[in-house]
Swiss-Prot record:
It comes from the Bacteria. Interacts with FtsZ. One of its GO terms (biological process) is FtsZ-dependent cytokinesis. Its main location: cytoplasm. InterPro entries: ZapD, ZapD_C, ZapD_sf. SUPFAM superfamilies: YacF-like. This is Cell division protein ZapD. It comes from Aliivibrio fischeri (strain ATCC 700601 / ES114) (Vibrio fischeri). HAMAP family: ZapD (MF_01092). Keywords: Cell cycle, Cell division, Cytoplasm, Septation. Cell division factor that enhances FtsZ-ring assembly. Directly interacts with FtsZ and promotes bundling of FtsZ protofilaments, with a reduction in FtsZ GTPase activity. NCBIfam families: PRK05287.1-3. It is found in: Cytoplasm. It holds the Pfam family ZapD.
Amino acid sequence: MNGLGMQKFEHPLNERTRIYLRIESLFRKLGHSADLTQPFEYQVFFSSLFNMLDILEQVQVKAELGKDLEKLRLQYRAWMDIEGVDQSALLSVLEQISQVHQNLMQTTRPGHSLKEDRFLSALKQRFFIPGGDCCFDLPALHHWLHLPLEVRCRNTHNWMAQLLSLSDALSLWLRLTRETARFEPQIARNGFMQSEMENANLLRLEIPIDQGVYPMISGHKSRFALRFMSFETNKNCEKDIEFTLAVC
């Protein structure tokens, strides 16, 4: 259909999902940079880690995610009485939900042990000063960067391991949420579309890259509106845009 492929966008329909997506993005950056294979990957790793700790300090993610996993568990249990449902697959999902929920609830507040780490604590205080990672600003970091790679990688993976229960629980909730809806073809007339739905958490869009547009979306759990913008002009797109949409 087009030579450039598809671009994907996701838009949260409540603040809780917004936070979950931000945390997922930070986990992805941590995972990609933890092996420190490139000279400045430590900057991506530490900035992502410290952003994560700030979110976890401000928001009761463990409690909210625990509630959402319990809601999912009840929804899936209700499907056990529906004829034609694959019971083995359903039981597998229920087991996964129970396991990650148990692991999450058994941990202390996510990120607390990292906050108490003296090296990370000292580093975090000055890391976001513009250009503040010079050796005279952060001599401890300068020393750490000269340790053997295997030592530094062991550190980064140990720090990430302390967030593993949160990562597993969040990944499962987002995966199951995304799987609740299929992509359906849509047309935004004159670049605009609005619709109503019930208790949705997330919008997912796939748009051909060669359309040259990106979406501006507003909405909540029962209603949304989207307007496509031209990348070249940064103005409203006035043409019809074909895309696919999943309301999760």
